Amino acid sequence: MTLYPKLILDALATVRYPGTGKNLVEAEMVADNLRIDGMSVSFSLIFEKPTDPFMKSMIKAAETAIHTYVSPDVQVAIATESRQAARPEPGKLLPLVKNVIAVSSGKGGVGKSTVAANLAVALAKLGYKVGLLDADIFGPSVPKMFQVEDARPYAEQIDGRDLIVPIEKYGIKLLSIGFFVDPDQATLWRGGMASNALKQLIGDAAWGELDYFILDTPPGTSDIHLTLVQTLAITGAVIVSTPQQVALADARKGINMYTNDKVNVPILGLVENMSWFTPAELPENKYYLFGKEGCKQLAEEMNVPLLGQIPIVQSICENGDKGTPAALNEDSITGRAFIELAENVVKQTEKRNAE
């Protein structure tokens, strides 16, 4: 028996791709690399995505069709191609990002998102290329804190992939689930759905070249944290707490989570937020509302650096609500505090990278 291309293509035309009504030939899924050598046939099937759920069944169906309609003696070799480039492996999703910093807290209400936003701004003011991902899927705040609630990221094809283009504000690339949901609508997702949404914001976005990629993580410890450490090569974690003992107890848990053998993320240091209250009219006065130097004591106990102490000043809240982070004003008390924090984060990051 002599084989020729039409025999093979006619056989493949009997195989339909599920849900389209088209056969493999009509759907242009048979690549133009069909080769025949005696009773051996080789070619590629083209799928839209490298993770096509019907890939294995289509390969099997194509082999069966050739054996049924041509000859059971034909040796078939089928390779696969995809019209969309494959997503990089976990841990290599952002090859152009130099440092990934997770900003975390053991509990809510300690100002973690405020610290993350202002750290990103301060790093940008120091001249670094910065991205900020609002990984707090169930309580996104980045759109509000940067006054971009009405912004809607768009998709653009880059290197054969459809990627989400982050919003840019104050020289920082921003993405948040808050850009895609109604701000008044609660996000009622199971852990798997939230993790998948987060993976999309990381791996399916055009982050480009960044010196620092800041992750504003959810408070506490959750599936989201595990997703982050399994998806990204995190350079280090910054733990935010107030000086209050109940907050410090949860901060200790956060440190232990990251240093767990299964997670193994270095702790860059602690940030003490709400260290003291300073009234605008009396900038030299300090009132320790939540205790004094609690984070300093915890840092010494856990043998991690104290990266900064951020005072309570009325303008921090006002600026956050207006979408103008306090770090934009380097001459203010809080602006200077956040610049110092950013400088210390850079020092600890460089130290960690040199090890």
Task: Describe the function of each predicted region.
Residues 1-34:
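N-proximal, solvent-exposed amphipathic alpha-helical segments enriched in charged/polar residues
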Residues 12, 30, 97, 108, ...:
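Residue-level signature of catalytic and energy-coupling elements of molecular machines
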Residues 26-29, 36-37, 41-104, 353:
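Extreme N-terminal, non-catalytic leader segments
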Residues 100-136, 270:
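Walker A/P-loop phosphate-binding motif and the immediately C-terminal alpha-helix
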Residues 123, 128-184:
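Phosphate-binding loop that captures ATP/GTP phosphates
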Residues 153-156, 177-192, 199-227:
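Switch II (G3) loop of P-loop NTPases
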Residues 322-332:
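C-terminal boundary of histidine-terminating zinc-finger modules
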